[in-house]
Amino acid sequence: MKLSICIPTYNRNESLKKCIESINKIKIKNKIKINIIIVDNSKNNNLLKIKKQLIKNSKFKILFLSEKKRGAFFARNKYLKKIKTSNHDYICFFDDDCVVDKNWLKNSLKTIRLKNADIVTGPQIYLNKKVLNYSKLFEKNYGNKKIYSVQWAASNNVLINYKIIKKINCFLIKS
């Protein structure tokens, strides 16, 4: 099985290092090959300061891309264009401030298998209380007893069957 991980980053070298450290701790079977593509979304190439260190300390292959248009949307599109002709089984999106549990991949693949799912998102734990907790929108009883609907799922912790990306032709998104 081949997995490609996309991490857009914008001037957060320290949290990116922690993210890569946590990915290095993921428990994997020998049959699983992982590569990481980091998309630098800063205009000043701030990532250059830690590039060599990240490569040296990672047990997985790391590739770096640059996207000058600001925003995770543009960075993820740059990634999708880069992997368009690849033969990955799954792709994953993390944010540069994600810290991944060592059992993340095992649990995500188990969920895909048990639920016959093509896309799995995981939980988010916010360490900063100022961050809006969108998960509250999914609660059935939210004080006034309204049910809120959102048209998206969190994209900072998602595993996607790559066949789906090709099937719906996500590569043609203009950025």
Residue ranges of each PLM-predicted region?
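Cell-envelope/extracellular polymer assembly enzymes that use nucleotide-activated donors
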Residues: K2-S4, N35
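Short, well-formed alpha-helical segments that are part of the catalytic scaffolds
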Residues: R12-I26
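A conserved acidic beta->alpha catalytic loop
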Residues: S22, I38-I50, C98
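Short beta-strand/loop segment that forms part of the nucleotide-sugar
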Residues: K33-K43, L65-S66
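Short beta-strand-to-loop acidic/aromatic patch adjacent to the donor-nucleotide binding site
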Residues: H88-V99
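Conserved donor NDP-sugar-binding/catalytic core segment of glycosyltransferases
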Residues: K102-N133
